[in-house]
UniProtKB/Swiss-Prot annotation:
SUPFAM superfamilies: P-loop containing nucleoside triphosphate hydrolases. This is Uncharacterized ABC transporter ATP-binding protein C323.04. It comes from Schizosaccharomyces pombe (strain 972 / ATCC 24843) (Fission yeast). Signal peptide: none annotated. One of its GO terms (cellular component) is mitochondrion. Its main location: mitochondrion. One of its GO terms (molecular function) is ATP binding. It is found in: Mitochondrion. PANTHER family: ABC TRANSPORTER I FAMILY MEMBER 10 (PTHR43514:SF4).
């Protein structure tokens, strides 16, 4: 039986520059592969090589045996879905944080959106949409508004948008990024069911710290665009078990004793309703100096909406009972939005999606002193702060590179650094380590554990317990818009 894809000592070129040199790889019909590697290892590029996005040399060394004698083109038969890239990650839905910026007139249903994604004969469009929705357990949500989909449902909607094309091979780049435990389990079950029926065949990319799904049979490991292992999953020694020459201090087992100081943010009886749906319900929360909060909750629970209030970036802010740094928001004796944001460092998937990728890494850090993404004046104080961060996280070699030229994971890490560089009174980290290598996560933990001052506070969101730094000394959980603060 013909294999799906075959490289035989192939060099892949992009504008005559080699991406991978002399690689050999074969995807057999009964195999499901995981491409594993650190940020910048070439995972996404390798998936695009499989898709046929780059020039193979020699041309005869690369083939799609499963298409031999068929009229299907590779671009029809092979679909690539990049969950971590800017823009695409939010393509299927509107983020909670921006719900209230949207007008119902611009909303659409899931069914209409999937019909719009279909590229085949219109006569079969409805049938293909129904089948794709069934495969992703979304049939009951077809009449629903995209706005009301949770993160996990939206991820499945993105998957359905590719399945409507009926691909024979589906390439998924970091499909589990940003999903809570339940959503990861549901998605894994769906992908496993598809793989059992070989409809479609699945290849996905993962970080070294990600759990390899049960349905995966083979692993290909990449390091610096070179294959370091390919073969059965059972024989694979995970990259995280390899020895490393990178000195990384272990996380502190206990957080430093810190005196809890005065309130920085305080909210009372906060409610938020979008078109009849109560997103936040009677929230009472105070964030004080010295506190290191972990805010948890499932996808769609209201976390991001709550943080939009915390950072002063919600359009209903003026109608809410919130004090920032001891002052109410508003004219006169109140505090302005600009004053609020000047005292807060913030990173999130939304900021990453909207951040200008033409900025260099240095310029991205400098923009921390701007209330927008523009580049403010460079002063000696700012230069010293940026230089310290570049030194702290070993980023000097990339400081002059545009964000567009580095991996998505490194882009997100630069924006984490942007959130801390000016030592703001409040650091707000919404999924800061999505797609970030373990090395940099450890370095970030060491900084947060040891170098946040007693007068600073922190709030961090993550769906992975091991992405929370040891300095966390307060926890809150949000469920269906209700906040529970743990002792």
């Amino acid at each position: 039986m013909a294999s799906f894809v075959k490289f035989a000592n192939t060099t892949f070129l992009d504008a005559r520059f080699p991406l991978f040199k002399n690689v050999s790889f074969e995807l057999a019909r009964k195999q499901n592969w995981a491409i594993i590697g650190n940020t910048g290892s070439g995972r996404t590029t390798f998936l695009r090589c499989i898709q046929g996005s780059f020039t193979p040399s020699p041309s005869t060394s690369f083939s799609y045996p499963f298409l031999k004698g068929k009229s299907d083109s590779p671009w029809q038969a092979i679909q690539l879905l990049d969950f971590k890239s800017s823009g695409q990650q939010r393509a299927a839905y509107y983020s909670e944080r921006y719900h209230s910026f949207r007008d119902k007139e611009h909303d659409t249903t899931l069914e209409k959106w999937l019909l719009g994604a279909y590229r085949g004969n219109e006569k079969f469009a409805s049938q293909h949409v129904q089948e794709a929705a069934s495969m992703t357990q979304l049939s009951h949500l077809l009449p629903s508004s995209l706005i009301n989909l949770s993160n996990g449902q939206s991820r499945r909607a993105m998957l359905a948008s590719k399945l409507v094309q009926r691909p024979q091979l589906l390439l998924l780049d970091e499909p589990y990024a940003g999903l809570d435990v339940t959503s990861r389990s549901v998605l894994s079950s769906l992908l496993g069911e598809m793989s059992n029926h070989c409809s479609p065949k699945i290849v996905l990319s993962l970080r070294p710290q990600d759990k390899i799904p049960d349905f995966i049979t083979h692993v290909l490991e990449l390091k610096n665009k070179k294959i370091t292992y390919q073969g059965p999953k059972e024989q694979y020694i995970p990259m995280t078990s390899h020895s490393t020459n990178i000195p990384v201090k272990p996380q502190m087992k206990k957080s430093k004793p810190i005196t809890i100081g005065k309130p920085l943010i305080s909210m009372e009886h906060l409610n938020c309703v979008y078109w009849g749906r109560k997103v936040l319900s009677d929230i009472n929360w105070t964030i004080r100096e010295g506190e290191r909060w972990a805010l948890t909750g499932s996808n769609g629970s209201g976390k991001t909406t709550l943080l939009a209030y915390v950072v002063g970036d919600h359009p209903k802010l003026f109608a809410s009972n919130i004090k920032f740094f001891g002052k109410s928001i508003g004219p006169g004796t109140g505090i302005s939005i600009f004053d609020i944001q000047e005292n807060i460092g913030h990173c999130s998937p939304e900021i990453h999606n909207h951040f200008p990728k033409q900025h260099t890494c240095f310029e991205a850090l400098l923009s921390a002193w701007s209330t927008t993404f523009t580049i403010p004046k460079l002063t000696e104080t700012r230069l010293a702060a940026i230089s310290s961060i570049l030194e702290e996280f070993e980023l000097k070699d990339i400081k002059d590179k545009p964000l567009s030229s580095i991996s998505v994971g490194m882009q997100r890490f630069i924006l984490f650094c942007r959130a801390i560089v000016k030592q703001p009174r409040l650091v707000v980290l919404d999924e800061p380590f999505q797609g970030v290598d373990t090395k940099y996560v450890h370095m970030a933990h060491n900084y947060l554990n040891e170098k946040l001052s007693p007068s600073q506070a922190m709030v961090i969101i993550s769906h992975y317990e091991d992405e929370l730094p040891a300095c966390v000394n307060r926890r809150a959980h949000i469920d269906n818009g209700k906040l529970v603060i743990h002792a």
